[in-house]
């Protein structure tokens, strides 16, 4: 009986998706499809699977001369091309069929039971093949590093161009629903409800002193130098316009002293654009003070959308994230629960207004026309409206116009230009309230918007491949590389089942698994850890029932190990796990204080799963790109 339970626990790894490997070609069903080792089945249909079964496999066999192999990357690329080239009418037919099926809960449950029963029958009908597959699967897992995979929201990784587009699209749809509801609630009021004085919006701009993507840890590092918040409405224009400089805490931002010199050229390039020192502004405020100021302004208008320039979206997003991380746990919570759901590019918000609000033109501007207008940079903010900070007011061009207050003014001027060009009902242009900048197309010194660049998914895949090649040069029994950034990625492919849905298809065929779902940061994370020892928004004597999931980290020669008592929230009664299989790891490695904090029950659950699956094995504990 105990042996049966032990075997049963081997199948209970669906909670740890990283341990879900693919299937072997030796064990197949009677129809030629592989038998999956995964227990989970889904009763829903997907457009891709309908296409694959009804059209894709036959077309592939006819044109390529052999059967489609889902484990062959070349075959997957060809099938992806077939799928995207599908006839629109046929795709709509599949979509209707999928919507009709998935919308019927009873039918979904019935299909799920039927598929589970079929899988059980196949396993009992071919017990030898299935046991062979299971043994091969367990052998593969035993040869790879085991991983505790904590869930992470992909929305927190926006340096990938495709992920940023998806994030902006999701928040745009949310803003559209909110505006539709607002207009419906004010339908009995006379005039355009968007022209009320209580309908306010806020623009936030950030210019960083340090901004760089680090492929080794799959993170964007952005430390703000200046931040500005502009509150306005459609009737009165600018209501409030403030900015702050941020003190550059190099010791906190660069845990290793060598990094300061490595990124000096990058910081100098960014600082020169803003006219400040690479070591940050001389009279900047403390980062936690700036975040508290920002939080105060945003709380004054809790229902207002938070707008920013799409071209500098990551300047704003990661800059505020850095301030929240520096400030403390409550600041992180405010960032996650208030700022992330509300932040939206001003270009997308303008499109939402033109789509939902009444206009006096037969056809409103398209998205591309709106984006082109916001790229117009031959604008000089009016001096009498206090649209420059005191530092940049007397600076020469082009440094003067990189001031974040001036950038907000130029964004707002283009916003009103679009509203005026589409003749929003009830909107009356009133200079200088709605014409806050002077157009001067002859001034070639006016700078264009500095872009917060992102990387495509293909480039990210290349970086990951390079890192994996570097990792393979070092054996785990050796002391390890001299540069601790060379221990980075750990992931396993998902099991692509016959009945998987379209989302799993996208993970398998369109993008690498490690970038789409569980892209893992290694122990050598050099993004600033949360300064819990000096947290500004948490009482220092508060003790929390928590367990730290440690991650191995190479000691910097300039620093001694930090004692665990330095962090009030970081303690554990378990023995630290090592990334190295030897019983006596090198003394050059330490366990960092802060990694990923779970409550004790959740931590015990993960450790119990690991102990039951592979008792006595050493595990490499890692964490995701999250707070």
UniProtKB/Swiss-Prot annotation:
Q: Name one GO cellular component term.
A: RNAi effector complex
Where do the segments described as Disordered lie?
1-31, 467-487, 523-589
Q: Which UniProt keywords apply?
A: Repressor, RNA-mediated gene silencing, Translation regulation
- Pfam short name (any one): Maelstrom
Q: What happens when the gene is disrupted?
A: Insensitive to RNAi-mediated gene silencing.
Any one of the GO BP annotations: regulatory ncRNA-mediated gene silencing
Bias type Basic and acidic residues, positions: 7-16, 467-478, 526-537
Its quaternary organisation is: Interacts with rde-11 (via RING-type zinc finger domain). Interacts with ergo-1.
Hey, which family's this protein in? Belongs to the maelstrom family.
Q: What does the UniProt record say this protein does?
A: In complex with rde-11, required in the endogenous and exogenous siRNA pathway for biogenesis and accumulation of secondary small interfering RNA (siRNA) intermediates, such as 22G-siRNAs derived from ergo-1 targets.
Under which name does UniProt file this protein? RNA interference defective protein 10
